[in-house]
């Protein structure tokens, strides 16, 4: 089996193993946006919140989409993934055609003037973060898998099935993991 930590890099999905029971990360799918010797940053893709972006963030009145829980770190910060790095200054390309961050005032203006559509952005409250060596230790414990990411996965609203589909896409023994009950004792 491949050492999955070795292939982890920005643009990869981080999939919680079935053994990871931490309520912050149980059956989560994260997009890794930064991964280096200092640590890692990612955003949980399958945890929409009950709040709409337009209700929670000023300046984004046109976004009638759910705000997402990006992770348990700095939950007073807002982050955005989008497909419009061509018009947003300071955006960092994570995978081809998918960007992280950029000038929020410019983003607000472009959304409110119709240049950017709500379907091209996803907002996150907080992020998932690991210090140097922390994520590697979690991989050694068997807490995580990796998979390739796509823009479609980031912008899907099929939250309930995202984890099982992403794990199943790895094939082989992962198909069994993807089909395992959330509470094995209830099997």
From Swiss-Prot:
Signal peptide boundaries: none
UniProt xrefs under InterPro entries: AlgH-like
GO cellular component terms given for this protein: cytosol
Pfam families: DUF179
Family: Belongs to the UPF0301 (AlgH) family.
The protein, known as: UPF0301 protein CT0663
């Amino acid at each position: 089996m491949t050492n999955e930590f070795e292939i982890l890099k920005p643009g990869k999905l981080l999939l919680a193993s079935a053994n990871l029971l931490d309520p912050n990360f149980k059956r989560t799918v994260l997009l890794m946006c930064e991964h280096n010797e200092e640590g890692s940053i990612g955003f949980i893709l399958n945890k929409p919140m009950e709040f709409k972006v337009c209700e929670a963030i000023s300046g984004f009145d046109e976004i009638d989409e759910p705000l997402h829980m990006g992770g348990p770190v700095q939950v007073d910060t807002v982050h955005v993934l989008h497909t419009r790095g061509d018009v947003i200054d300071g955006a960092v390309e994570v995978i081809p055609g998918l960007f992280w961050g950029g000038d929020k005032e410019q983003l607000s203006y472009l959304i409110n003037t119709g240049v950017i559509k709500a379907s091209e952005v996803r907002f996150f409250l907080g992020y998932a973060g690991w210090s140097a060596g922390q994520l590697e230790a979690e991989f050694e414990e068997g807490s995580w898998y990796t998979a390739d990411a796509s823009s479609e996965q980031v912008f899907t609203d099929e939250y309930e099935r995202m984890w099982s589909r992403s794990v199943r896409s790895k094939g082989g023994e992962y198909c069994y993991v993807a089909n395992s009950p959330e509470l094995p004792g209830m099997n």
